[in-house]
Amino acid sequence: MSLEEDIVSDDEMNMIDEDDATDSEAESLSDSDTENEITEKLAEPTKTAIYNRDGLLDKLQDISWPEDVDWTHKLTVEIDQGGAVDVNDDLARETAFYTQALEGTREAFGKLNEMGVNFLRPANYYAEMVKSDVHMEKVKSRLLHEKKQIEESEERRKARDNKRMAKEVQSQKMKERAKEKKDNIESVKKWRKQRQQSGFSDKAGEPELDFESGKSFQRGGGKKRPGVSPGDRSGGKGRPTSRMGNKKREFRDSKFGHGGRKGLSKQNTAETTNDFKGGFRGGKASGNKRQKR
């Protein structure tokens, strides 16, 4: 960029700053004009305004305290601040408030003691509340109910948060286990590949790992107990059978078989078709039916 372009850009920036200053001045002037207009409108009396000075003085005389009224009815205390207080200074203003309240209390306390007026609350004073005990009991029960609801909602929220955290931890553990399993498989594959490259490629002498065949993930480890059916959860101790029961079971098994498909159990074969040893059993016809010739 050349020097002329820099100068032009600086001039443009100065012009922008001057425009901003002009806009701010115009806004301030417009605000001041608006305030002046409002002040003038407030200063001008309305067409329906009535200035009744005598009536105002009469009303002031009606609501003002009489000159001979007792001080106990007014309880007014005048405090000399000793000088002007800067209202913009927070510390000085608050100090003036505190001093005025303290000095006024001391002066009123002394006057009441001199007049012999009992203004302190006795020790056995019972201040009756505006609201009855029944109403306050209802308010108390409602507040306790709301507090209980808030606590229950907080407990439910904590339970949801704990459940969500438990799910996240469980999923993280599952991911870590899957990653660990994958790393183990990759390391074993890498080790075997290195053995093959080194000349040890005989797979007959290598042991079979459980995680490759999937046997480690089978339930029960593939072990079976003798004499226990696969669906027996009691381990063969659920229904102990007697010796006579075993004989009955053997006879039924020899007669009916051990279950399975029965669809072709009664189908004739060549041997059963040519077997006439048993003969034929002719049934007797009933008396109501005629015999076929």
Swiss-Prot record:
Keywords: Coiled coil, Nucleus, Ribosome biogenesis
A GO BP entry: ribosomal large subunit biogenesis
GO MF terms held by the record: GTPase activity; RNA binding
Residue span of region Disordered: 1-45, 150-293
Pfam family, one: Ebp2
Gene Ontology cellular component terms for the protein in this record: nucleolus
Annotated Acidic residues bias: 1-37
Polar residues: bias regions: 265-275
Stretches with biased composition (Basic and acidic residues): 150-167, 173-189, 247-256
Highest taxon, organism lineage: Eukaryota
Coiled-coil parts of chain: 135-190
InterPro entries (UniProt xref): Ebp2 (IPR008610)
Coarse class of the protein's main subcellular location: nucleus
Subcellular location: Nucleus, Nucleolus
Entry similarity comment: Belongs to the EBP2 family.
Described purpose of this protein according to its UniProt entry: Required for the processing of the 27S pre-rRNA. Plays an important role in plant growth and senescence by modulating ribosome biogenesis in nucleolus. Associates with ribosomes.
Subunit structure, interactors included: Interacts with NSN1.
Stated name of the protein: Probable rRNA-processing protein EBP2 homolog
Source organism of the structure: Arabidopsis thaliana (Mouse-ear cress)
Originating gene: EBP2
